[in-house]
């Protein structure tokens, strides 16, 4: 399968065609393959490489970050040590962590100038890999979702995201990056918002962020299921004077239920059903959380804007808001990068729930292809 100018990729045909995926290329690669970084991302990449028959020779970290650590039984090398050890053969590096911090992204790009570097796209949640087989199987749905995009920026970004997911090439990540404030100001016109539902509010950071762009905001309902993050959210709500912040410890889902939740206390804590198989085996603490459809909460409340950043549960949360979306069509900001299916599944679902929505795809700076946002406006 070749993605050419006659397909949905016509808006970025200058970037060339994609005829195979990163995993196929790595299988036939003659250079040693090394991991760049440690943690959950590395575990997922190792598991994928094992399934694909790709050998990982070593693991390295940026110079200054190595202190004798072991990872999967190997001593972690510094980048300088890796370059010295593989001086004759060279090597392929697979980025296995992510960051939005400018200095960290600069370090990543510098490594990419000194060796052959790719950022494999492994799902944040779920077990489905966005490889060439997946792309072929879902091409019609990808095409349909692409056609729902309202502007050229969205279409260009949509195409580049597929190219990145298949190749891991960082050059596809920077063309259309925007700041969150630009999205609030120029796309959402947030200055008109008076009420807001934040699904996945973490410690209140997105309420704080929105208030900069929405001076008329009066009420923010902030849902956060994780107990540690919720404690921070409560403290923020008590201190915020610009609007009324109402914190609620609950999760968003398609129906009322009690689900098992990763009780790790980090920003990516999630419903355990959403975790990938390799991550589930390493979760040590879980708890039961109450989840409910946002529609139940919104029966007697109006909101202008809803944000969905619910760690892989976006589809279920949108289903749980279907009545509000159908009847009132508030502006939506939906995270579209947690699952491999999200790129086409979420636009198609939103169009089904509310055909009047105009759909936009935007991305804020991040390596790899995280912080991909689907914006819906009537």
Regions found by a protein language model. Give the residues of each.
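Phosphate/nucleotide-binding beta-alpha loop and adjacent structural elements of enzyme active sites
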Residues: 1-56, 62-378
